[in-house]
UniProtKB/Swiss-Prot annotation:
GO cellular component term, pick one: extracellular space
Further facts: Plasmin is inactivated by alpha-2-antiplasmin immediately after dissociation from the clot.
Top class in the EC scheme: hydrolase
Span of domain Kringle: 40-118
Species assigned in the record: Capra hircus
SMART domains: KR
CDD domains recorded: KR
One Pfam family matching this protein: Kringle
Name of the protein in question: Plasminogen
Subunit comment: Interacts with CSPG4 and AMOT. Interacts (via the Kringle domains) with HRG; the interaction tethers PLG to the cell surface and enhances its activation. Interacts (via Kringle 4 domain) with ADA; the interaction stimulates PLG activation when in complex with DPP4. Angiostatin: Interacts with ATP5F1A; the interaction inhibits most of the angiogenic effects of angiostatin.
Swiss-Prot/TrEMBL domain comment: Kringle domains mediate interaction with CSPG4.
One GO biological process term: tissue remodeling
């Protein structure tokens, strides 16, 4: 079941195992947020994407957002506390066209990630 990895709390909110609180107007709203978080696709420009993909369109591995090696940058978890800059997961902290990451390849600073748009967003 989708909600097995979530902890039930008071009212219409859930906590993920990492203790991230997901608030909602109803249990159904919370379940929808949980489902969106677990998807390997993104909605809109992907600013809300919180999946665990960490590979770029060319197959490069993503650099951790808290690391400055090999690329120094300003997009840190401290600078963007609500952007979900966890581990080396693909994210879109600056409202680009889709989720992206800095790469571990010293010759390639960043790339968009190998993610699809969710089907209901397709044109």
């Amino acid at each position: 079941d989708l909600l097995d990895d979530y902890v039930n709390t008071q009212g219409a909110s859930l906590l993920t195992l990492s203790r991230k609180k997901l608030a909602g107007r109803s249990v159904e709203d919370c379940a929808a947020k949980c489902e969106e978080e677990a998807q390997d696709c993104y909605h809109g420009n992907g600013q809300s994407y919180r999946g665990t993909s960490s590979t770029t369109v060319t197959g490069r591995k993503c650099q951790s957002w808290s690391s400055m090696i090999p690329h120094r940058h300003q997009k840190t978890p401290e600078s963007y506390p609500n952007a979900g800059l966890t581990m080396n997961y693909c994210r879109n902290p600056d409202a680009d066209k889709s989720p992206w990451c800095y790469t571990t390849d010293p010759r390639v600073r960043w790339e968009f990630c190998n993610l699809k748009k969710c089907s209901e967003d397709s044109e």
